[in-house]
Amino acid sequence: MAQHLQGVIGKLANRLQRRLMAQQNRAWEFDLDEGILDAARLTRVVTNPMHALSFKKERDTNFRDTVVTLLLDNSGSMRGRPIMVAACCADILARTLERCGVKVEILGFTTRAWKGGQSREAWLAAGKPGSPGRLNDLRHIIYKTADSPMRRAKRSLALMMREGLLKENIDGEALAWAHNRLLGRPEQRRILMMISDGAPVDDSTLSVNSGCYLERHLRQVIEEIETRSPVELIAIGIGHDVTRYYRRAVTITDPSELAGAMTDKLVELFDETSGNGESDRKQKQRARRPTGPRRKTH
């Protein structure tokens, strides 16, 4: 099954690479003193023999210094086939983007415990004060940094399948964390892709706070990024309608569709070399960068 999966993802990755490489070689410089002879301008030499020959040269376009962050839901509901597919997609697509000169960071998020960790113990010791906020300890994982080559991350990605790693998912703080890492990058274009299979859930937190506490915080973080940040945000939901939260999103019904969805969305983003996508980024870059969500869990 793993080999078949790699083959399917590999074909999609090759399609992505062909599209990206075609974009890189789309521009030409004309009227140069050296390069490839420009046959279209030979008539000038015929009509005026004293006119020098004209040459042209292909010009690379490197996607304006781009970095992509893949943020993967490492919750318990992803156990088994979904997390294996997600890890395989991240691996192969990151290698593909890397070959095209695009840097990729791969991150994951879960919690350290099922029913609250030290955060809950501290709350109990304090006498259970009201509205405590988050009552579980976060686990944010860096599987691959943007500056490290993909060949060094192979063993790290295998950790996603480790027994006992996948627990609860507190999406809002994970999204803010990944976003802040991107804000510190020097690249001109920064893309954040969230892959999740459900709404934020942590039983320890939700049992003692107001309803939709984690979901409300997630919506606040998304709004900050989508309206005030230069980072381009996109989400893919596995069996979960993420279009309820994100402006730019797609929902798939089965993990086997993940590679196709990721590839399609990346092609769509990189096709935005002009037009509305570019103008949207410029508008966001003129806005104030977010300092974080208006209401933080603690």
Which stretches of residues belong to each language-model region?
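Acidic, glycine-rich A-domain
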Residues: 1-298
